[in-house]
Amino acid sequence: MSRVRQLLDKLPWYTDNIHSILMYLIMGGFTTLINIVTFWLCTDVLNWDYRIANTIAWVASVLFAYFSNKKYVFESYTPTWKEKAREVSSFFGFRFLTYIVDFLVMILLISGLGINELWAKIWTNVIVLILNYVFSKWIIFKVRK
């Protein structure tokens, strides 16, 4: 346990649930930053199509998200290969589901409504962040008894 966590744990209102949400917001912020910066680099610097850029940004951010969520947000411990396989497959499976939501909303906002690519990316990240938290908290990293 980190020194920061030890200090925060002394606060009477600081619970494990608050810690989990706070860490998710911090790690989710980094994940979102990776996603948006990667998307921006691909679209504005490399001049790639937004659909390709969105896919590359998704891969980069999901890889970061898995390790940061496992270690810092949900503090998941999977001692057996079977548990590790279940956790990894459910994480990437649900992230792929939210990627489809992301992709479809991006097409709707950009091609359908004519919204700026970067603004569309920011709005879809809000939707995806909420969905990913719900899936991670109650399905993927759920404490098994």
Curated annotation (Swiss-Prot):
One Pfam match: GtrA_DPMS_TM
Sequence intervals crossing the membrane: 21-41, 52-69, 96-116, 121-141
Membrane topology designation: Multi-pass membrane protein
GO biological process, one term: polysaccharide biosynthetic process
First-listed, main subcellular location of the protein, grouped into a coarse class: membrane
Compartmental location: Cell membrane
Superkingdom of source: Bacteria
Keyword annotations: Cell membrane, Membrane, Transmembrane, Transmembrane helix, Transport
GO cellular component, one term: plasma membrane
Function: Involved in the decoration of cell wall teichoic acid with galactose and glucose.
Family: Belongs to the GtrA family.
Protein name per Swiss-Prot or TrEMBL: Cell wall teichoic acid glycosylation protein GtcA
